[in-house]
């Protein structure tokens, strides 16, 4: 099945995030305001996050997490070299403070992250996600991936960002759980 849609991501330091994905008119929204996380989708409706799902969202919403991996992970173990889309990548198993291990694949020549394999808690249980990052471009002196391919047992999709802007004013209220409709 080949579906298309749009995605909008809003982030604000230190740890607020809003993601809106619209596919075939159906909206999937997820937010975190620094304290509380929420999701709104056609299958589960509007709900607050709790437990492991909330902690993962808190970690993923850390604006600076790509720059401070030692804050997220307690131990790193280089396990070898693998190919990711025809590129050599160092494979690093990174242990999370709350338990579990993510696999990070770093491009040998550039050091940029090419793939992240991690487990996420959802209303449907624990799901393993693989996220491939590519088409890195310079945005205000920072290399950012403009293409993100996410796959799991339940889904497989590619997000292509048309533009990324830094230092855009973000209203704090947009990150909070909306009122039920």
Per-segment meaning from a language model:
Residues 11, 80-83, 135-138:
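Short, low-complexity Ser/Thr-rich regulatory SLiMs
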Residues 38-64:
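Acidic/charged, solvent-exposed loop-and-adjacent secondary-structure segments enriched in E/D, K/R, S/T
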Residues 4-10, 30-34, 47-54, 106, ...:
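Short amphipathic beta-strand/extended segments with alternating polar/hydrophobic composition
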Residues 88-179:
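Gly/Pro-enriched, hydrophobic low-complexity segments
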Residues 2, 27, 37, 45-47, ...:
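Short, solvent-exposed loop/turn motifs
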